[in-house]
């Protein structure tokens, strides 16, 4: 390939990337501080900025990426865990790293709340990344920002979209087991209740549908789904929708036999591609084989069902909207400036 042709291809690729990036940025709400202007936006937006650590910790994103990659090589399921960790952090008093705090004399933390106990994981991965960052940039980067970046890297590693993460969050000094029990959606909840919890935090029904798509790489403990396998609505029979797919039902029953000892075993929410971030979750919902009650209930609302159909048919649309909703979620209740602290270790407030 001669020099002129190489330059032509380079310019063409650059133009395509520029058009894509402009389209991605324009997807954010009007007034959003996208890091290329000085506005602070409105609603969920804040004083976060994509370039917050460019001078104070220039290797930050490389360190986080390396830490997530090391963990992923040993355990591919950690990708889903890191993504869930960010969600569970943000939904309890904001994206402040509170989920990472151990219990203390002053408070009972979120780790042992009902939705998190023996379920949420990835704490050691975040702590290891924090240790590496402290070696380069002592007391500079918040644990809350590390969680947000790790969630993004987890999605990218499994084939999902990349999105710029606004940074500058500060860490909380406390955590609340009670708030976690109250604020986090349950897999058994009705769509109306789940949506109400999202709306309280400034999100909406579309965000419910989009962020539920994270279940494409998710897992559930067997006790959450066994009623659909063996005794749906007290019938003593499987859910007819799952029974219609005999191969899937058989596989799920093998994974989650009808004995108490299987309650803590794990079943993939997207069995066909459990380590690939794709739109198969929505295809499953269209086929009435979403495993969680809170998943399949999306099809009971016309607006939500229409979004599910769109995402099942258009993976690019899902990827774009997922990135936008993740940034929205990552702005919930953030502390910036002199509020909060920068923890030296993520499990301890001081």
UniProtKB/Swiss-Prot annotation:
Q: Pfam families attached here? A: peroxidase
Q: In which tissues is it expressed?
A: Expressed in the whole plant, with the highest expression in roots.
- Write down the glycosylated positions: 102, 193
Residues reported to bind Ca(2+) 1: 89, 92, 94, 96, 98
**Which region is the signal sequence?**
1-27
**Reaction it catalyzes:** 2 a phenolic donor + H2O2 = 2 a phenolic radical donor + 2 H2O
Answer yes or no on keyword Iron. yes
Tell me the function of this protein.
Removal of H(2)O(2), oxidation of toxic reductants, biosynthesis and degradation of lignin, suberization, auxin catabolism, response to environmental stresses such as wounding, pathogen attack and oxidative stress. These functions might be dependent on each isozyme/isoform in each plant tissue.
> Any idea what this protein is called?
Peroxidase 10
- Species of origin reads Arabidopsis thaliana
The taxonomic lineage of its organism, from the top, reads: Eukaryota, Viridiplantae, Streptophyta, Embryophyta, Tracheophyta
């Amino acid at each position: 390939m001669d020099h002129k042709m190489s330059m032509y291809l380079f310019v063409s690729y650059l133009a395509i990337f520029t058009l894509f990036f402009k389209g991605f940025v324009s997807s954010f709400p009007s007034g959003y501080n996208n890091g290329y202007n000085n506005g602070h936006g409105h609603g969920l937006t804040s004083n976060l900025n994509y370039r917050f650590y460019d001078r104070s910790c220039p290797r930050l994103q490389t360190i986080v990426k390396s830490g997530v990659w090391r963990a992923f090589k040993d355990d591919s399921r950690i990708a889903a865990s890191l993504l869930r960790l960010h969600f569970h952090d943000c939904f309890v008093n904001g994206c402040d790293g509170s989920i990472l705090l151990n219990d203390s004399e002053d408070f009972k933390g979120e780790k042992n709340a009902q939705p998190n106990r023996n379920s949420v994981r990835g704490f050691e991965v975040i702590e290891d990344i924090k240790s590496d960052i402290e070696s380069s940039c002592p007391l500079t980067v918040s644990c809350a920002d590390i969680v947000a970046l790790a969630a993004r890297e987890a999605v990218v590693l499994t084939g999902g979209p990349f999105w710029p993460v606004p940074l500058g969050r500060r860490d909380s000094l406390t955590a609340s087991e009670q708030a976690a029990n109250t604020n986090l959606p349950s897999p058994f909840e009705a769509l109306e209740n789940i949506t109400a919890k999202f709306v309280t935090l400034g999100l909406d029904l579309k965000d419910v549908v989009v962020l539920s798509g994270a279940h494409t790489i998710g897992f559930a403990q067997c006790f959450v789904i066994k009623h659909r396998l063996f005794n749906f609505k007290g019938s003593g029979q499987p859910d007819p929708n799952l029974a219609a797919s005999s191969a899937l039902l058989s596989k799920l029953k093998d994974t989650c036999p009808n004995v108490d000892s299987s309650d803590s075993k794990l079943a993939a929410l997207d069995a066909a591609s459990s380590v690939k971030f794709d739109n198969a979750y929505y295809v499953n919902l269209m086929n009435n084989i979403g495993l969680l009650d809170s998943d399949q209930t999306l099809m009971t609302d016309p607006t939500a069902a229409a979004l599910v159909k769109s995402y099942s048919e258009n993976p690019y649309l899902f990827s774009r909207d997922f990135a936008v909703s993740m940034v929205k979620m990552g702005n919930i209740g953030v502390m910036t400036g002199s509020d909060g602290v920068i923890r030296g270790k993520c499990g301890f407030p001081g």
